[in-house]
C-alpha cells in the first residue's frame, strides 16, 4: 500500500501579515488585529512582534493592551483575508484536488498522487511556499508527514516561514519529546489531567495502555493511544461542507453562581464569533450545551428566522435557553446543580447530525 503523503500549510500570523503587507508603516511593529484596546473584543491575530510580549489569539484586547501598550490595534478586514485565502487555495489546487481548508489560513493537501507527478512531497511543499510568497508576498509554514496529525504538528515546529518533514521511520522519535498539550484534541483541562497522571510528553502517553487511557478519558482514550503511536487514518476531505461550528469551556471548578456563569457564557460567545468569522460561517440553529458536576449532559436548541454570527446575538439567544437551568435559592439566582462546562454551537437548520468535533475547547 502506498504510504500517504500529507502536507499541512499554515500561513504565518495571517491577518496581521496581510495588514503589514498592505500598510508598510506597520512592518516591524507589534500589531494586533481585533477590537479597540479598551473593549471586551478578543484578539483575532497578533504579529510576531506583538507575540514577543505574550499577546495571543483569542486573548481579550484589554489584556493585550496591558501586555503590549505600544501595540497598534486595527480592525479585521475579513473580505480582504478571504480574497487572499482564495489565492492560496488556487495554488493548492494546482497540485491536487484533495485539499481540505480548515480555515482561511490553513489547509491539508493529500499529494500521494498529484497532478504534476512529483514523487516527493517535500518538493511540492517547497514549491507551494515559494508560489504563495510570489503571489501574495506572505510567508507560510508547512509540515510533511504520512498523516494529518503528523503534518500539522510538523508545520508548527519551525514557525514562522519554516518547513519540517517527518519521514515514516521517524514518526515515533518526532512525537516522543513533544508536550501532549501540543496534540490536537488535548485541551487545557485534559492536559492538566494528563499531568496528574504523569503524562507530560508523547513518550509518556505511549507508555500507557489503552485500558488505562479509556479508564481516565473515555472514548477519547482510544484516540490518545493511537496518536501517541502516530496512527491517524483520517482522510483529507476535499468536499466537506461545514454544517456546524462552536466552542466550549470546561471550568477549573464547578460553578453555581448565575452572574459568574453568564460571564463564562459571554466569553464562549465571543470565541464562537471569532471562529465563525474565520470560517466565513453563519447559521440559524443555536445549540446550548451544559455539563453538570456529575457529568450529566443537557442540550437545548433554538432555530431563528435569520442566520446569525455576532457574539451579542449568540449570547442573547443562549441566555434564553440557559434560564430553565436556574432557580432562586435564598434570594439568589443559582444553577439547579453545579455546572462544569458550557458550550455554544451554530448550525444550519437542516443539519441532522452534529459534527463530533463541533465543540472545540477554548
Curated annotation (Swiss-Prot):
Tagged with keyword Magnesium: yes
Organism (species): Leptospira interrogans serogroup Icterohaemorrhagiae serovar copenhageni (strain Fiocruz L1-130)
Cofactors, names only: Mg(2+)
Cofactor note: Binds 2 magnesium ions per subunit.
EC number: 2.7.7.7
Task performed by this protein: Poorly processive, error-prone DNA polymerase involved in untargeted mutagenesis. Copies undamaged DNA at stalled replication forks, which arise in vivo from mismatched or misaligned primer ends. These misaligned primers can be extended by PolIV. Exhibits no 3'-5' exonuclease (proofreading) activity. May be involved in translesional synthesis, in conjunction with the beta clamp from PolIII.
Protein name: DNA polymerase IV
Site (Substrate discrimination): 15
Active site (catalytic residues): 106
Residue ranges of domain UmuC in the record: 6-187
UniProt subcellular location: Cytoplasm
CDD domains, sorted: PolY_Pol_IV_kappa
The keyword ATP-binding appears for this protein: no
An annotated GO cellular component: cytosol
A GO term, aspect molecular function: magnesium ion binding
Family of the protein in this entry: Belongs to the DNA polymerase type-Y family.
Keywords: Cytoplasm, DNA damage, DNA repair, DNA replication, DNA-binding, DNA-directed DNA polymerase, Magnesium, Metal-binding, Mutator protein, Nucleotidyltransferase, Transferase
Listed InterPro entries: DNA/RNA_pol_sf, DNA_pol_Y-fam_lit_finger_sf, DNA_pol_Y-fam_little_finger, DNA_polymerase-Y, DNApol_IV, PolY_HhH_motif, Rev_trsase/Diguanyl_cyclase, UmuC
Residues annotated for Mg(2+) binding in this entry: 10, 105
